Amino acid sequence: MGLLRLVFLLSWAASAGGLYGNPLNKYIRHYEGLSYNVDSLHQKHQRAKRAVSQEDQFVHLDFQAHGRQFNLRMKKDTSLFSPDFKLEVGGETVNYDTSHIYTGQLFGEQGTLSHGSVVDGKSKGLLKPLKAHSYVEPSERFFKDQAVPFHSVMYHEDDIKYPHKYGSEGGCADSSVFKRMKEYQMSVQEEPEKHDHKEDHEDSGPVILRKKRAAQAEKNTCQLFIQTDHLFYKRYGETREAVIAQISSHVKAIDTIYQSTDFSGIRNISFMVKRIRINVTSDEKDPTNPFRFPNIGVEKFLELNSEQNHDDYCLAYVFTDRDFDDGVLGLAWVGAPSGSSGGICERNKLYSDGKKKSLNTGIITVQNYGSHVPPKVSHITFAHEVGHNFGSPHDSGNECTPGEAKNLGFKENGNFIMYARTTSGDKLNNNKFSICSVRNISQVLDKKENSCFVESGQPICGNGLVEPGEQCDCGYSDQCKDECCYDANQPENLKCTLKPGKQCSPSQGPCCTTDCTFKRASENCREESDCAKMGTCNGNSAQCPPSEPRENLTECNRATQVCIKGQCSGSICERYDLEECTCGSTDEKDDKELCHVCCMEKMKPHTCASTGSEAWKAYFKGKTITLQPGSPCNEFKGYCDVFMRCRLVDADGPLARLKKAIFNPELYENIAEWIVAHWWAVLLMGIALIMLMAGFIKICSVHTPSSNPKLPPPKPLPGTLKRRRPPQTTQQPSRQRPRENYQMGHMRH
């Protein structure tokens, strides 16, 4: 029987933790077995895979565990993989269908969320409730050589006991490693690329008050290249479906964390897998596989990943199942807004050791001190290492390490994601970034985001626009003034949905009241325009129905155009069964007439004349209609200015013409040809120039003073003015006294 890998991310309120009579391993103190019908689920998956209708695309899974009934409704999720997703297995590119990845919720329970994959039949997963997270995994992962009456196990996060006693920096490398990495990052031999996107953050949107990146507002997705070594492949049953399910669950976990974080106005940061390379067991003997050796230290393992060129990706990670020294679960290069290389969007560069490397990399392992860590610890480790890539060092200080506080109120909330040691994941702060991390990450995003991030193509909850898949969108909690809609800070399957009992939301359209009900029919919702009458609500929709159009050929746009099917798109000439034409330049037409609206009889260009001319006086009563400023004129050779004069367009301005005149290659070719033909003239000019310079030096040298006492004094130039001394007098005191006053600046009494 094939396997079903089901990765859940559920939100539900349950209280089944705390019973430790059935331990699973040294980390998991209690579990329950699941044994639902795998054949039935596999058939449902195959039917949903081929489904065309909306209803048939859902997969239903019902099972009972921990004292309650679970009714899952899941739909294919393509948001985690880019449209050009590429999969390599064993060195070969294979066509792969990602339709086995699902996202859904518990039927009838708002705010719940499931994310997973369905492949052939059995379940593995993660349950992430509102109050108590739970996880589902295949039983063979824990009972390899034992026959058990169930195919999956389910356990609560309250039943997970992850120790923190392994080393001062358990989970992340110690400070000496980061110091060496920082020094290496500073040794780049190439000038780091400079990114200045300050202007992208200045505009503010009209819908909700928040920062917007005007030029590239939707470039919010970091594309990933993820490799797995042969040990990771062995760990997950030697099937590519199981490996991709693991990658999917990790990416979904960090995607949820980063999307819900406001990085100083930069929001909805998401992740998408662009490429996966799976090293299978046969790659263990492949000499081209850099990860083939079993005993590789964590720093060397990261270096092997960095030695590949990852310019096509925002980040590149390697997943492994290795037990690194000192309990290290992950390692990554720390990004910075400027001054050093490394982190998101970093390009392949040359460093002091003579090697070109890509420092937009990191590594993750799922093994720690001989045991495999729970999924939630691995997910937070991934978010932690990616946080390094995004520019955040480890948290420090009282403000950002509340778990070290003496106050029990702060301490019980736990530390944040970027805490130096691994967190258990069950505390309030364990899945959040501290204010210190937010400040650091926002600076890096501001500098680098637009250099490699891409548009996600997915609806963005929180941008104030109701997009496909959203019921409403009132923005984030600090912006939402809507009592009808859940804001974007709510749980995944709750945000951007209508609150219970609410009929509509003002974010859906102008025909919804602030009381969350539809406006009465005939209430105005759109002002009238030149080509459309006033819009009125219909009483059963939040959106304003299309306005009734005015009659065709109604004048609009200051009587320069006419209405066609409710749009101001026709020429005023059409009102009189004429065609619009362009007034050409003739001796009789000045630059003002070239900016008139001109008409002609159909198929008769020679009849083209201004609306103010005698030819069309019968239609326009002698009134001259002018083009809008900026309109093309004189057969597209110019444009109309605000004074209704046709300004010819000179593609080559004076500076451009001067540049072309000086640097014209033909000019230098002509000069070269002339020199070849008249070489004797060039020779004579050279001799004359040398003689002129020699004569100048000879003549001027006799008049130039010299410090050499053996040379004669310089001769004065003819006509040089000589300084005359004043006549000597016998009144010496009277001559010196004014001089003293001038030099000292004193006044004498």
From Swiss-Prot:
SMART domains with a match to the protein in the record: DISIN
Cofactor note: Binds 1 zinc ion per subunit.
Post-translational modification: The precursor is cleaved by furin and PCSK7.
Transmembrane recorded as keyword: yes
Highest taxon in the source lineage: Eukaryota
GO MF entry, a single one: protein homodimerization activity
Cofactor(s) for this UniProt protein: Zn(2+)
Residues the record lists as binding Zn(2+): C172, H384, H388, H394
Keywords: Cleavage on pair of basic residues, Disulfide bond, Glycoprotein, Hydrolase, Membrane, Metal-binding, Metalloprotease, Notch signaling pathway, Phosphoprotein, Protease, SH3-binding, Signal, Transmembrane, Transmembrane helix, Zinc, Zymogen
Pfam families xrefs: ADAM10_Cys-rich, Disintegrin, Pep_M12B_propep, Reprolysin_2
Cytoplasmic side: 695-749
InterPro entries per the UniProt record, alphabetical: ADAM10_ADAM17 (IPR034025), ADAM10_Cys-rich (IPR049038), ADAM_Metalloproteinase (IPR051489), Disintegrin_dom (IPR001762), Disintegrin_dom_sf (IPR036436), MetalloPept_cat_dom_sf (IPR024079), Peptidase_M12B (IPR001590), Peptidase_M12B_N (IPR002870)
Span of domain Disintegrin: 458-552
Residue ranges annotated as Extracellular topological domain: 19-673
Ranges of residues in domain Peptidase M12B: 220-457
Primary localisation category: membrane
PROSITE patterns, per database record: ADAM_MEPRO (PS50215), DISINTEGRIN_2 (PS50214), ZINC_PROTEASE (PS00142)
Listed PANTHER family: ADAM10/ADAM17 METALLOPEPTIDASE FAMILY MEMBER (PTHR45702), DISINTEGRIN AND METALLOPROTEINASE DOMAIN-CONTAINING PROTEIN 10 (PTHR45702:SF4)
Note on domains (UniProt): The conserved cysteine present in the cysteine-switch motif binds the catalytic zinc ion, thus inhibiting the enzyme. The dissociation of the cysteine from the zinc ion upon the activation-peptide release activates the enzyme. The propeptide keeps the metalloprotease in a latent form via a cysteine switch mechanism. This mechanism may be mediated by a highly conserved cysteine (Cys-172) in the propeptide, which interacts and neutralizes the zinc-coordinating HEXGHXXGXXHD catalytic core of the metalloprotease domain. The dissociation of the cysteine from the zinc ion upon the activation-peptide release activates the enzyme.
Record's protein name: Disintegrin and metalloproteinase domain-containing protein 10
Species this chain originates from: Xenopus laevis (African clawed frog)
